[in-house]
């Protein structure tokens, strides 16, 4: 696809600029991603506000409603370092029945992890408490996110699930979410290691950049040397290739055993926090989560994260709607509504 080639060229430009000392990579990539502007829908009233210290953009239908509307709060993707509230799937929402909040959490590396997750919790809590002032039914609020935004949506729902001082989140929509950092040798990692916008090495490098770690740790992490055997044994009931349906394991080859490197584990401890790897949450949390829709793409290194979380939710009797895009790839949502970057597909009808 021309759009993929163009974005790869832009990333090459960002890498070259960084190597020459012209501009840091994350700064230039942020400028590039923010430069792709979606069209604003004329039927919307748009307001820029703050929920606590978190900037948000509110999209309210201009047409009157006889009853309170449903609400959506979106956390954008971008590895916690890129992206903004100025673009996302807002062009594709059915505005006559929804009010829409897009949250701009503070970005890494300027703001250290877990600032991003905490900002998402702050914005969501504020919206749940004040929804009626925006004409929204507080019992019909959906939390939504794509990629890293899907991580933040997942961890936000987990963190708020047992709160009794705020309304319950009605549902979560997770679009090709990143959900675990224990195993980077799942079938989708092997199959899609060099496919599309998000290669396996690029993903792990972005993880390390987000956590303000050195990308020289990438090789050890890809090999699994950051995980002690005790942790592998503890979590294999939730994260293991055997839990992936057989039809998704074509040509899968089990990796060679990795030698544990304690220094790498110490350097990457944040990766095992449930805010960062929500798949590690205990059943006592997962079993109380709201109805969930998970969207996965076949040509995506993160496909199996979604499949594993789907299984965990279903095993805990949480209602799950699963939509799998056979021709989809990681980041496809970013191209919706950008003229030559638009994708006429069934994807839009799922929202």
Each language-model region and where it sits:
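Extended alpha-helical scaffolding regions
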Residues: 28-30
